[in-house]
Each structure stands twice: as C-alpha cells, then as structure tokens.
Amino acid sequence: MAKSALVWLASVCLVFNILSLPFLALGLSSCGGSCQTLNDYEGQLICINGECNDDPEVGTHICGGNSSTPSPPPPSTCQPSGTLACKGGKPKNTYTCSPPITSSTPAVLTNNNFEKGGDGGGPSACDNKYHDNSERIVALSTGWYNGGSRCGKMIRITAQNGRSVLAKVVDECDSMHGCDKEHAGQPPCDNNIVDGSNAVWNALGLDINIGEVDVTWSMA
C-alpha cells in the first residue's frame, strides 16, 4: 500500500512539472522580466541590461514601449577620409560623408558671409553667384550637400530656444578641401555643419558673435 502511494505521488509530481514548463518559459520570456544570459528568453526577445526586451537586430516590437530599456541607436558609419592642415594650423579630419538625415538631424549652425569678399570665399557652388546676407540661405557639409542634389531646396532649422526658420540651400560647406583662396584660407568644414547667413541667425534669435550653436534640421 505504501509503495502504491509513493508511485502515485511520484506520478503527480511528474505531471505537475510537465504542466509547469510552458509557464516557466513564458515567465522567462516576459517583456521586462529579469534575465541573466541570452538563453533566458524564447522567441525573438533578447536579454538587454538584465531585462527581456525586443531584439533590435531582428527588429521585433513585441514589448512595444513597455520596457524601460531603449533600443541602442545604429552605429555611425561616417568615418574620416583623411586629414588636412592649413599653414601653421592643426590637422583637421576630412569627410566625404555626413551623418544620416532624419526628421530632426542634429547639426552645428555656423555663420557664413555669402557676399563677395566675405569669409565664404568664392561664389556659391549651386549657382556660381554671390548672395546678400539678408537672404535666408545656407551651405551644407559635403555629405549633406550630396553633389548638389539639395541645391535650391528648402530646409527647416530649429534652435534650442524653440524657434525655427526655413532656409534655401545655395552652397557646399566643403568637408574635403580648404586652406586655399577658394575657401578664404579656412580649413575643411566638419561633416555636421549648417552654415547660415546673418538672416538665418537673426530669424532664430541667435547671437552671431557666439560663432556656432547646436541645432536640428530637416528637409522642408
């Protein structure tokens, strides 16, 4: 009798363990649940910083925005192509590319004189003309200028004070060349520059004497 009872008890335990397995797996793969290794999840979730979350490489959205752990941003693929140093100056990186353009692209706004004899050097690359600084116009870093494909197009620039302005692309802020007469002796531009006229700075309510400020921009 005792032996039969033990057999019955063992059978019950076995059935309970089998029935518990799906719930255990579900618990391990729950969004936001704790985990320690990549094996602590099932399906298309991944262990990120000790939490089960969507796998950014797979592109799943099972967890949605419930997890406190954001997906990591894609790595930047824009790397320097070389260096160039003006006489007596330090070497600067040169670029053929710029960061990806988004609906709110981070950039550095600088000030440029588009008039003849100004610090912009030669005439604007888009139309081979000089422009009055009262125009709301900009030059874009080489990668964003993209061989002139954005010439004449409008972009929206937004400052950190909340003000924004529409400006027309008329020139390239050369990230590859510099230190010569064509570039007014200036070194190459960084790869994240929006070089704006006085009118752009004034419309944004910014002090031109600051020289450069962080902004965002997008195609209008």
Curated annotation (Swiss-Prot):
The keyword Signal applies. SUPFAM superfamilies: Barwin-like endoglucanases (SSF50685). Expressed in ripening fruits. Keywords: Secreted, Signal. The keyword Transport does not apply. Residues 1-27 form the signal peptide. InterPro entries: Kiwellin-like, RlpA-like_sf. It is found in: Secreted. Coiled coil: none annotated. Its main location: secreted. GO terms for cellular component: extracellular region. It holds the Pfam family KWL1. It comes from the Eukaryota. Belongs to the kiwellin family. This is Ripening-related protein grip22. It comes from Vitis vinifera (Grape). The lineage of its organism: Eukaryota, Viridiplantae, Streptophyta, Embryophyta, Tracheophyta. The gene is grip22.
